[in-house]
Amino acid sequence: MQAPTKVATRTAIAASGAPVTILAFAGDIASTSKEPILEAYGATDAQKLLLDFSGTEYVNSSGIAIIIQLLLDATRNGGRTVGIFGLTPHFQKVFTMVGIGKYATLSPDEATALRLL
């Protein structure tokens, strides 16, 4: 049974001194995650955005499609810089294989992600 997706929003400061909005996901990322993820994303106008997957154990193909939709909107339409951190080793490989690294920097942890933004 899938754990419902929750998204918490917080602010941090990048190494450059710029404000960063962090969307921290908890639960599984699947088709039912679209509304909470895109709603949280739509509520921020930050130019630097981090997606925190440290509270996520499972992401299915529908979940990956939602993340790609968010990334395409953020980078192409919004001109935003996006980073991702907290992926399990398995999903680090999956995200790399499907090309998410073209749209977001993949980092092992928050400190590294903030340094790279």
Indicate residue ranges for each PLM-predicted region:
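STAS-typified acidic loop motif
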Residues: 2-39, 53-55
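Amphipathic alpha-helical interaction surfaces in cytosolic regulatory modules
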Residues: 31-104
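Short acidic-hydrophobic, aromatic-tinged amphipathic segments that line or gate anion-handling sites
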Residues: 105-109
